[in-house]
Amino acid sequence: MQLAVHQDDADILLKERNQLNESILDKYRVAGQIAQTGLKYVISLINDSYHLGKTETPYTCQELCVMGDSMVTRLLAKVYNNDIREKGISNPVSIELNEIVGNFAPEIDDASKFTFNAGDIVTITLGVHIDGYAANVSHTVVIYPTGVTIDNELKPPGPLLGSKADSICAAHIATETVVALLGMALTPEKLPTQLDPNNTKLVTGKQIRNIVNSIAESFNCTVVPGSKVRRIRRFLAGQAEGVVAEKDFKGVVWSESDQEELLLNKYNKNDDQQLVLHNKQGSEFTNNSSAIPTDEFVVAADEVYNVDIKMCSTSDFKELGLVTLEEIDEFTGLNNKTNEFKTKSTIYIRDYAVNYQLRLKNSRSLLGKIDKEFTVFPFKLSHTSPSFPATNSQDLATLKKELIANKLGLSELANRHLINAKPIQVTKFIPFETILKTSNPTGKHGIDSNKPALPGMEIPLPHLGISSLKLKALLKNSSSIANARESTTVILNSFNNANEVIRLTGGNNSAPSWVHSDYSLNPQCKESVDHLLQLTKDKRFGIKVKECQPMKLTADAPESMQMD
């Protein structure tokens, strides 16, 4: 179903309301400050609980999520109380452990106690919007074993090693490099010749893809499908990808087909028999109105980008294989492996293209609150409760009781498709030998309608003729693989000739954990990366980068919010 929007209204929403001015920049900055503060707060809770031993029992994922969301909500209550109509959470706090990719934010009433162990890598993801202008962030931290005291300070006994360390290094370096490359759009004359051999003086999607792929290859990593570097706009921060086709989509998106193409290109170089590859790129640079992602676009000044890079190392596997995503729900694993991870989706998003006359009073009340408070951004059922945001353990106990009453209304909304659950995904590794030996009589035309996909990316392996349904069936032969994720939001600001990169999230406030990788950048890639990163440090002749700093946290008592 397509929503009817007049062209004049579309121009206002997509163009006029996204032209940077001082008011819009301030809204972005405040959203970035709150997001940075929320991230710092959740990291401090993890450190206090798992590294410093300040709590009697470790915090669970449920407690970390509700405490993080509560902190962000309290900070939002202090800003823009009379000037705007909408503000809130653009991405609920989610805690992704090891192989989990995103949207894992269990409710406080979940019976399972999700905790961490030494050696785990944990990704914290959250987002904030002010009047629809969003700032999202993701950062991966390491859970260390019991530390040692050095100079009266407790420190980790040593760095994290192995494949997890490789993925953290690759994700961090790729994110920092892409931020610097995006900043070159403000001063394209400084673009390194290694990245622009034709001297076009343009920053393109192809350059972004090539540099990220080179960094991943250097660390023996694979870019996880779903990673993207995309432009975001007011109310369009990628929160409804796969549900709503976004007009004028502009960004680089990684999928399984990119791994397939890289493998086939490598095969063509080493063999006289050439395979015919489909060229998905356009013939010239364009900023057309297509909703289908393409690398053939030019990064321009006064645009806002979200850099979301996920890496996983394949060092633990001897054979070549495909990294893909598996969707997890409460039924996963019930008919095969008893110990397999399973959980319910808890993050939802409203679909305004669907209307239905609800029967239950509870459902109508819940829908009204969703439309009023959350609009097009994701939410959790706990966010609709009167006891949210929670400030103490008594609020958490009340919140658990209120969730029971709201679940009946939520079920009708989900059954009538008025809201869609955002799937919890995990990274999986499938050997290519398994893929090549499988029979596929139906060809590549079997599309999994339940799996959200961007337009043009419904078929994961087009050259091998493997459909999404067939790939889903092959997941029973897959192995879980840990991933690291780094996400940051940046503004390429030229308003009033500022020519500066405003980094809303990430940066020095998201310093990588102590890890050590046996890999390093290959010489050609290292030259380009070093050049770009050096420009970000040269304030006079390089790229001017300003980072949003977190707010000062007042004295809270997070221990009082811990459940028994």
UniProtKB/Swiss-Prot annotation:
Transmembrane segments: none annotated. Its EC number is 3.-.-.-. GO terms for molecular function: metal ion binding; metallopeptidase activity. InterPro entries: Creatinase/aminopeptidase-like, PA2G4/ARX1, WH-like_DNA-bd_sf, WH_DNA-bd_sf. It comes from the Eukaryota. GO terms for cellular component: cytoplasm; nucleolus; nucleoplasm; preribosome, large subunit precursor. The keyword Hydrolase applies. Its main location: cytoplasm. Keywords: Cytoplasm, Hydrolase, Metal-binding, Metalloprotease, Nucleus, Protease. It is found in: Cytoplasm; Nucleus. SUPFAM superfamilies: Creatinase/aminopeptidase, Winged helix' DNA-binding domain. Component of the nucleoplasmic and cytoplasmic pre-60S ribosomal particles. Probable metalloprotease involved in proper assembly of pre-ribosomal particles during the biogenesis of the 60S ribosomal subunit. Accompanies the pre-60S particles to the cytoplasm. Belongs to the peptidase M24 family. This is Probable metalloprotease ARX1.
